[in-house]
Amino acid sequence: MFGAKKGNGHNKDFYDFNPKNLETIRNDLKNRHAELVIDALLKEEARQEIKRIIKRDYPVHFMDIDEDKVDDVIEYVVSELVGTGVIERLIKDRPDITDISYNGSHLIVESSDYKEIYKDNEHQITEQYITRLIQKFAHAVGKEFTPKNPIFDGVYGSIRINAVHSQNTNGNSTMSLRIVRPNLVLNEKNFETFAPQFIYDFFKVVMESRNNILISGETGTGKTEVLKLLFSFVRFDHKAIMIEDVPETHVKSLFPDKDVFSWLTGNGVTVTDEIVAALRNNPRWIMISELRGKETYEMIQAVLSGHHVVTSLHSVDAETSPKRLVNMSKIGYQVDEKSLEEDIMRYFNFGFHIKRVVVKTTDTTGKPIKRVVRYLAKIVEYSVEGCQMVFEQKYRNGKFTFSTGTLSEEFHDKLAEIDLSYELPKYTDEVAFKKGLIISR
């Protein structure tokens, strides 16, 4: 009988489920239900069948568990045996998590607000545990993770994973997971943590008037989230094509009422191929989640043919993004650098640069914590004469301040053509109060 002990004070934590019993069940399931175990990582019905088998065939291992905890313990056992263990529990219990990594010694958990070492039950996080976890991910997508195949890149559900085998590290295997959920992380309600409200209004008119935009920043600054927010302002009558190598934006589920094609690269199809294909589908917008190489040249040609583009790239600042486009174009094409850069400066309208900073603050109880803040550092307007600052935000000496510049007559004329107007307010070193964020030094 399951859960013979109830309400007697014996509240055994299911994370302490006997490892030997776990291993016994694991080996037995592999021998008796090998195909079902494989299916259970991807198929919910197979996972439920595994739960039924465990409950039916292994009651002796659950005799000392409180009756009201048995289902939770079985769920834990299943997550360890056929799921992704601590990873799926973290994702389920902490919906704000964006990144989980293992550096060979510690499991690091990160969200938009914090970065910390995962300490609970850390005795479980061993090299063997992590390697087994990576191999589950690899198997799920039809790849191997072995000394002969030491680098693994893959996508499993909402998780993007990269792992390097201990064969090629100084120590244990390493792993990085990016968790992408189908929601609008940056939105109107929390926008003021990112930039002032008048910039949110600016984003709307920029998209309504169909401007070409480059979003730059380091890894982890939130470029994709800005791209998704901008996408939210695309009108139904402006067909959009989203091109990405991994399913990060989830634009089809986020914006079911928009006319959007959502394409993925892979199986021999490149970003370049999909840009060329996009031109045959009569879109107003071509959105490319990230530029990395020679596909940049075809993207520029799409702009020159009258299509509108929003894309992201790695660049040190918004001012150098046009030069980065030139250099990436050169990877696959012979180009006249000066002429190409002039085209970029003339036909791309704005550059947005994003930064992130870790600040000292307090939680709701007053406890000192460190918080990751992603913020809009700069907006520039491009022209053949150069870059004009539109907005700039800085973090200095424990304070966020922002200033505004000017918008060109050409931009105002563009708005007037579609009966829109926008006045950029004037600010110089204005202190930016971030909602819910009290910074201490």
From Swiss-Prot:
Keyword ATP-binding listed: yes
Keyword terms of this UniProt record: ATP-binding, Nucleotide-binding, Plasmid
Could you tell me the superkingdom of the organism this chain comes from?
Bacteria
Which residues are ATP-binding? Answer: G217, E218, T219, G220, T221, G222, K223, T224
Asked if Transport is a keyword of the record, the answer is no
> What InterPro entries has UniProt attached to this entry?
P-loop_NTPase (IPR027417), Sigma_54_int_dom_ATP-bd_1 (IPR025662), T2SS/T4SS_dom (IPR001482), T4SS_GSP_E_ATPase (IPR050921)
Q: Which cysteines are joined by disulfide bonds?
A: none
Q: Which ranges does the record mark as transmembrane?
A: none
GO MF annotation terms = ATP binding; ATP hydrolysis activity
A Pfam family annotated for this chain is: T2SSE
Q: Which family does it belong to?
A: Belongs to the GSP E family.
Q: What is this protein called?
A: Uncharacterized protein pXO2-25/BXB0023/GBAA_pXO2_0023
